[in-house]
Regions:
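Short active-site loop/helix that positions an aromatic residue
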Residues: 3-13
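Short, hydrophobic/amphipathic alpha-helical patches that form generic packing surfaces
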Residues: 7-9, 57-64, 189-193
Length: 277
């Protein structure tokens, strides 16, 4: 339709023709085509109810590239939600917000002199952000997501390398601790800005939490213009999904649907009493 009939209609109306038409491949269920007859259909409203809108948006956009078919399954959604969103992104946001509250009374500090580990983080964040931005500009959202996650992993590694809980015990390391907190927030801001097309609501909530701007012109600039902002209350961005509990709930819902479908139906004895004219 969009490459044959739509251009014909536009030409007939004298309207300008599209310069680019975006398409995407198939979405498979457990690497198989979805079909009602196979009983492997998934519906958007059910997925949103089970996992949340942003988690589903992220899964689909990070799973489906333009080159190959995408695959969807409950197990795959749970795995990506738990690893990418709960462990890598959500945990980083939660830890950073908690440490700023604990060590600086909730006020985001300004950075001071850099050390080698700081410079390494800045270079990694900028490199991954540029790679992600360039891919997003070409609509390669799946590939871009890989670089955003790599950026977040670098921030989590930065925490392990700098051990802020140890710095907090030594007053002479106060400025080092300021650097760590400020640069963690800058890393989160960069990832959150890039995540906006994937998870708009989550990105907005994280931006409000730290009070930072997610404008693209500030992407990975490391000027930390949010210093002095007060960190808000941080709940869990994404709760980890217990696979066993999910399977139990899924089986219960399937049983209830089957029971509901049988309601109102008559058995063979009742059918035999029916007079067909």
């Amino acid at each position: 339709f969009h490459t044959i009939y739509w251009p014909i209609i536009l030409m007939a109306l004298g309207e300008p023709l599209p310069k680019k038409v975006l398409g995407h491949p198939w979405l498979l269920m457990n690497n198989d085509k979805m079909s009602k007859s196979k009983g492997n259909m998934l519906y958007g409203d059910d997925l949103v109810r089970m996992f949340g809108l942003d988690a589903i948006r992220y899964y689909l956009l990070s799973e489906m590239g333009y080159q190959n078919d995408g695959n969807i399954s409950y197990d795959a959604i749970i795995s990506r939600t738990n690893i990418d969103l709960a462990n890598i992104y959500g945990n980083l946001v939660s830890r950073t917000a908690s440490m700023i509250k604990q060590y600086f009374g909730g006020i985001i500090p300004a950075p001071s002199a850099n050390e080698e580990v700081d410079t390494a983080l800045i270079e990694t964040v900028r490199a991954e952000a540029k790679a992600a931005y360039d891919l997003l500009d070409k609509y390669y959202l799946s590939d871009a997501a890989t670089h955003i996650i790599a950026l977040l992993k670098a921030c989590n590694k930065y925490i392990d390398d700098t051990t802020p809980w140890m710095l907090a015990k030594d007053e002479s390391k106060r400025e080092r601790l300021q650097n760590v907190m400020a640069y963690l927030v800058e890393g989160i801001r960069t990832a959150t800005t890039l995540f906006t097309p994937y998870m708009p609501t989550t990105a907005e909530n994280v931006a409000k939490l730290f009070g930072f701007d997610t404008s693209l012109d500030k992407l990975a600039d490391f000027k930390c213009d949010f210093a002095g902002n007060t960190v808000g209350e941080c709940g869990k961005l994404f709760a980890r999904i217990d696979k066993a509990e999910f399977d139990k709930q899924l089986a219960k819902e399937a049983e209830e649907k089957e029971k509901k479908a049988l309601e109102g139906k008559i058995d063979i004895e009742d059918f035999a009493k029916v007079s067909l004219v």
